[in-house]
Amino acid sequence: MAEARSQPSAGPQLNALPDHSPLLQPGLAALRRRAREAGVPLAPLPLTDSFLLRFLRARDFDLDLAWRLLKNYYKWRAECPEISADLHPRSIIGLLKAGYHGVLRSRDPTGSKVLIYRIAHWDPKVFTAYDVFRVSLITSELIVQEVETQRNGIKAIFDLEGWQFSHAFQITPSVAKKIAAVLTDSFPLKVRGIHLINEPVIFHAVFSMIKPFLTEKIKERIHMHGNNYKQSLLQHFPDILPLEYGGEEFSMEDICQEWTNFIMKSEDYLSSISESIQ
């Protein structure tokens, strides 16, 4: 029997449908069939509809692209157990308590989830680049469960104030390649924008190491705002930023604590997917 393949033009219409829509079943069945025929492991992530929809939505229901993304996701997790095999919150609690990472309370005008990372709160003498990477992976595994995030993707703000040589030394070519893989075609989230602020001159050497591994689409979505960033950042994220970045209603401390609490409450789920993929 010929395998159904969604036409790219149908992607936006299918993306807007709820998980239980019968119109999604052909794509789900076809992707599940490919995964089973290829012997994709059923643990720790069974091939449920909700799991497979992440990959279909991330590639606008193009079956071939969704299948490639699914394969790359398993390949990346299998090849990076130092990051992906331990997603227990306790593995990153120190970074969370330091205020390194928070998630904005509201989405941006396009519906994207907005994440903030503050390099000054990463002590490279205490936490490795893999620890920092694991923070992003844990957040990604949690927010990818949200249908609206599957549809509208994410945007990330990196505050690079405090970036030092000790941070740069942690980003080896191997780490750079793993970062690029997740940003491009190894995780079922649409990366809609990467915003860098307070970037020092010494950061550009690290960025030049990561850049060759990025797709042109991702490169086009990277915005460097410099030190005088507030006006340009507010244009992208009006009315949703914390006080430190030009907002009016809440602080970074507030959202860091809120997100830390959410991660800790999600410990059972994170533990359930914290297995090495063979």
Swiss-Prot record:
Which segments carry the region annotation Disordered? 1-20
Listed transmembrane segments: none
Coiled-coil segments on the chain, per record:
none
Show the ranges annotated as biased composition (Polar residues): 1-12
Ranges for domain CRAL-TRIO: 88-253
InterPro entries given in the database record: CRAL-TRIO_dom (IPR001251), CRAL-TRIO_dom_sf (IPR036865), CRAL/TRIO_N_dom (IPR011074), CRAL/TRIO_N_dom_sf (IPR036273)
Q: Name one Pfam family in it.
A: CRAL_TRIO
Q: Give the PANTHER family listed for this entry.
A: ALPHA-TOCOPHEROL TRANSFER PROTEIN, ALPHA-TOCOPHEROL TRANSFER PROTEIN-RELATED
- What is this protein's name? Alpha-tocopherol transfer protein
**What species was this sequence derived from?**
Homo sapiens (Human)
